[in-house]
Regions:
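A short glycine-rich, Lys/Arg-flanked "PGG" loop and its adjoining helix->strand segment in the class I
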Residues: 155-168
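Short glycine-rich, flexible loops that bind phosphorylated cofactors or substrates
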Residues: 151-152
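Conserved SAM/SAH cofactor-binding pocket of Class I
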Residues: 64-145, 155
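Class I SAM-dependent transferase core
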Residues: 1-79, 108-125
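Short conserved AdoMet
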Residues: 97, 163, 184
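Short strand-turn motif at the edge of the Rossmann-like AdoMet-binding core
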Residues: 105, 148, 171-175
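Conserved beta-strand segments of alpha/beta enzyme cores
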Residues: 99, 124-126, 167, 188-192
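Active-site capping/gating segments
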Residues: 175-219
């Protein structure tokens, strides 16, 4: 299914306004997040400098589009893997009432995530500084991951957090179908592909359900 491509900053802001109807406070939080992200990127490699002129398209709308695929506002925990710059996790936390768990193993990035959450007053954000393998298992409603790991490894590592009602939201760039085809058939059937709103050549894997080791053995 084709979607309208958000190819400029005005279009990205307009789409966010229409899709999520942010309050004045939420718009302010998004603007503040952008400012903090740009400032911190001069200190550590959070985003490519080439994307700074198009922050609303490349980072804010790119993150917000995942929330549009799971509108269960306030329903269960959102687990964001390899949160890094807080994309999409902090954008989700700003635009929704969802409790968001940001998992990141690098200390400097965790320090940044905590400082932004505090600065923006995001009481619905928890930052966990550890590799995913060392985090206690808990059921989550949504799992997102932006440039975290190859798809098969991502699913192996995060399967224990999934339930029958878990929604998987996984941006995979140009290789979505290729990575999906390498999965066991039971896993493949759990996912479908959606076109990204921010890049004509990028796709998002959308899945539903519980991933199990037993399914992995079925080809």
């Amino acid at each position: 299914m084709s979607v309208e491509l958000l190819d400029n900053e005005d279009a990205a802001r307009a789409w966010i306004g229409e899709a999520f109807e942010p309050t004045a406070g939420q718009w302010t939080q998004l603007e503040r997040f952008i400012a903090l992200l740009i400032a911190e990127s001069a200190q550590q490699n959070l985003i490519a400098s080439s994307t700074i002129p198009t922050m609303w398209v490349r980072h804010i709308a790119d993150s917000a589009q995942l929330l549009a695929f799971d509108t269960r506002d306030g329903d269960g925990l959102w687990l964001d893997l390899g949160s890094g710059a807080g994309l999409p996790g902090l954008v989700v936390a700003i635009l929704s009432a969802r409790a968001v768990l940001l998992v990141e193993s690098r200390k400097r990035r965790c320090d940044f995530l905590r400082s932004v959450a505090a600065d923006l007053g995001l009481a619905n954000v928890e930052v966990v500084e550890a590799p995913l393998e060392r985090i206690d298992t808990r059921p989550v409603s949504t799992i997102s991951a932006r440039a975290f790991a190859p798809l098969d490894k991502l699913l192996d590592l995060s399967a224990r957090f999934s339930t029958e009602s878990t929604r998987w939201l996984l941006p995979k760039g140009r290789n979505a179908l290729k990575e999906l085809a390498l999965l066991p058939q039971p896993w493949q059937r759990m996912f479908h592909v959606e076109q990204s709103r921010t890049d004509a050549e990028s796709q998002i894997l959308i899945g539903s359900g519980k991933i199990t080791a037993k399914q992995r053995g079925k080809r």
